[in-house]
Amino acid sequence: MKKLFLVLIVFAGCEKESNSNPKGLKTENVILITLDGVRWEEVFLGADSRIIMNNIKDEKIREETLKAYWFEDEKERRNNLMPFLWNTIASKGQIYGNKTKGSVMHLTNPHFFSYPGYNELLVGFNDDSVNSNDKVLNPNINVLEFMNEKDGFKDRVAAFASWDVFDWIINNERNDFTINSGAFPLKDTLLTNKQRWLNKFVSDLPYEGYGTSVRWDALTHEYAFEYLKLNKPRFLYIAYDESDEFAHQKKYSQYLSIINRLDKYISSIWTWMQSHDMYRNKTTLIVTTDHGRGNYIDGKWGSHGTSVPEAEFVWSAIIGPDTPGLGEMTNTETITTSQIAATIAHLLGYDYQSNRPVGSVVKEMIK
């Protein structure tokens, strides 16, 4: 019995050591979440009454949207749209990207659409050869696979995405950690009953309006949340997509509603983590996007791409034990999407390296 007790103590000590941060920081886990194509305007200014009044033709839907999301006060609008972001992250973390207050975040790639944006975010630099949304395996080393090779992270890294192109962006042929996207079923050895049900359900959906390359964010959320509970990853990436789909269709009411729902998804994940010792006070959450969109004045609020003015401007939010609670950032140095990968690795205790030089760590995000 004494020998067994000794073994348990040694094992517990090894477990604690394997999760310790090489830089002495408190962060042991990271959750990265992206909301595809969500404009900085809605994040910081809330719903735009001009788009509601002039874009929503159905009177009933227009009135319902005004009632749900429009308030005269700017802070009330944004708090109502994204309550977790503005009540929790803003009080204990940092939010970047409000151009009206001197906080600018932008892409370094010149394309302003998804694959180049996600490449920049995950690998830490712009690659001129990544210039389409085609299903081409990404040759660049990303921060997920970088961390998957570190002590204590092997098979503790995972990615879930609504858009199936992530299998190519993250490169599932080169990497063996869990990557699940689009209408592809989750093929892990260990599955919960809900994940088995999702596997059957995801292949039966018609995906009207999206095409077969995008699944509902509700499915992505349930896949990822179940994986989090079962597998306890140390680095989890979740990429939601429906915000971009509704914006392209210029369905502003649905666009606002999905932003509100995604905020609730993020809140549920954060709340769950606070009730578990592995994650509580040891986890950094980062929320950002892959590209911006045009503005109302130009008539391009639903569009993005090289030809769309201001589609390069994005935003980011962060909360965790190593991040000062400065709230909404104002009059800051300009930051870029290419800096997020190095910042994530640094928070986990490592100096990120890829196959090319990468963006620098956002020092303001770390104490």
Where do the language-model regions lie?
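Bacterial Sec-dependent N-terminal signal peptides
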Residues: 1-25
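Active-site-proximal N-terminal segment of extracellular/periplasmic enzymes that hydrolyze or transfer
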Residues: 20-94
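Metal-dependent active-site segment of extracytoplasmic phospho-/sulfohydrolases and closely related
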Residues: 31-32, 40, 262-302, 344
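Histidine-centered active-site microenvironments of extracellular/periplasmic hydrolases
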Residues: 54, 288-319
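Long, well-ordered early-domain segments
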Residues: 69-168
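Acidic, His- and aromatic-enriched active-site or binding-groove loops in soluble protein domains
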Residues: 123-136, 176-210
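Non-catalytic, well-ordered alpha-helical segments in soluble enzyme domains
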Residues: 148-151, 322, 331-366
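Active-site His/acidic residue clusters
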Residues: 172-173, 222-268
